[in-house]
Amino acid sequence: DEYLLASMVQGVDGALVGFASFIPDKIAELYDCVKKGDLKGAQRIQEWILPLKEAVYASGEPSGEAHARMKTAMFLSGRLKYDTVRRPTKKPEGSAYQKIKSAVQGAGF
């Protein structure tokens, strides 16, 4: 998702964005800004997304652990009622949990 803005400015009709399940309004707003040519607005949204992306995709590509971190972020933001994950995936703990919590709070949830 760090490449979302860069991809959109190349010209797209849409995209499949997993992160949109967490922040659909912001992803749509980013797309709208790009379509209108409001690159400053788009950059502002991208900068807002970045700490959340870093907390969720801490170790790179999406994985079971990244999905668990996404669920925790969605739970902490009030978008999910539960953050239950199935084995063998584990919920984030310790510093990983704190990083997600800080990012969610920093985003204003």
Cite the ranges covered by each PLM segment.
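Short, flexible active-site loop motifs that bind/organize anionic cofactors or intermediates
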Residues: 32-33, 60, 87
